[in-house]
Amino acid sequence: MFDLDEWIATVRKCKYLPEHQLKRLCEMVKVILMEESNIQPVRTPVTVCGDIHGQFYDLLELFRVGGELPSTNYIFMGDFVDRGYFSLETFTLFMLLKARYPDKITLLRGNHESRQITQVYGFYDECQTKYGNANVWKYCCQVFDFLTLAAVIDNKILCVHGGLSPEVRTLDQIRILARAQEIPHEGSFCDLMWSDPEDIESWTVSPRGAGWLFGSKVTTEFSQINDLTLIARAHQLVQEGYKYHFADKNLVTVWSAPNYCYRCGNVASVMKVDESLEPEFRIFSAVADEDRTVPPSRKRSEYFI
């Protein structure tokens, strides 16, 4: 037998699990995620978080600021891995919390929860370094394929990693997508992971090479069609931790990786939503250098891309 609480205690010390335990954990979490819909319904009160990017010690600070599970209910909007030093430990902790408290934490897919992206931006190399092979990376990528695409809070606030798609007018069109796959290079699934808001009216090509830039008019139309009061997303660094877009303030970016890449100097935030559906933002900074460890083989510039 295994003890999830014991595994959580181990990983919270920024240690990673043996390969056979990690494989078992991935199998458990896949079964849980398979039962979730593409748009997972969540009830208030809930705390919504943006990108983490392997900044493990800052994730522990997030839980200190936002509240610990299971007393606090969470939605994390993807990008758990890459760029930070501890993607493995970060994603392992998320999986452990999902296995231990499946109804208290909702994990959305981000554009970095992908085989192609993680081979470029750090997670693949980190798994190779820590385990001496790519097996654990493969197990985690299989979990990525089952992460849900979005969440909706009290049927009124949509949470998604990137943004909107010109191919999606209704939430039902998201609900019928086949999500158990690598993120496609184009199309609605791709757009949900990659798109960004911009000060335009409609749609234009994204400089990222995937997804779209979308404007105020299409955001308002999408919100009206689907009876939404707010769209929350992550995907873009915000120096102040969060940012409302457009005159209607019907879209907000939440960013939860402070001092991103250990050099950007930004603060981070979490968005607390109670029954009133009025968001309250809690701002936090990166933990002090003396309260974190840095892998001896890592220079800071390696993951800043």
Curated annotation (Swiss-Prot):
Function of the molecule: Has a role in chromosome segregation. May provide a dynamic connection between kinetochore microtubules and kinetochore chromatin. Negatively regulates mis12.
Region forming the signal peptide: none
Coiled-coil segments: none
Enzyme class: hydrolase
One Pfam family it belongs to: Metallophos
Domain of life: Eukaryota
Cofactor(s) needed by this chain: Mn(2+)
Name of the protein described by the UniProt record: Serine/threonine-protein phosphatase ppe1
SUBUNIT field: Interacts with sts5, ekc1 and mis12.
Keywords in alphabetical order: Cell cycle, Cell division, Cell shape, Hydrolase, Manganese, Metal-binding, Mitosis, Nucleus, Protein phosphatase
Catalytic residues as annotated in Swiss-Prot or TrEMBL: H112 (proton donor)
Binding residue positions for Mn(2+) 1: D51, H53, D79
GO molecular function, one term: protein serine/threonine phosphatase activity
GO process terms (BP): cell division; G1/S transition of mitotic cell cycle; negative regulation of isopentenyl diphosphate biosynthetic process, mevalonate pathway; regulation of cell shape; regulation of TORC1 signaling
Subcellular location: Nucleus
Family recorded in the similarity comment: Belongs to the PPP phosphatase family. PP-6 (PP-V) subfamily.
GO CC, one annotated term: nucleus
Catalytically driven reaction(s): O-phospho-L-seryl-[protein] + H2O = L-seryl-[protein] + phosphate; O-phospho-L-threonyl-[protein] + H2O = L-threonyl-[protein] + phosphate
Cofactor binding description: Binds 2 manganese ions per subunit.
Positions bound to Mn(2+) 2: D79, N111, H161, H235
Predominant cellular place of this UniProt entry's protein: nucleus
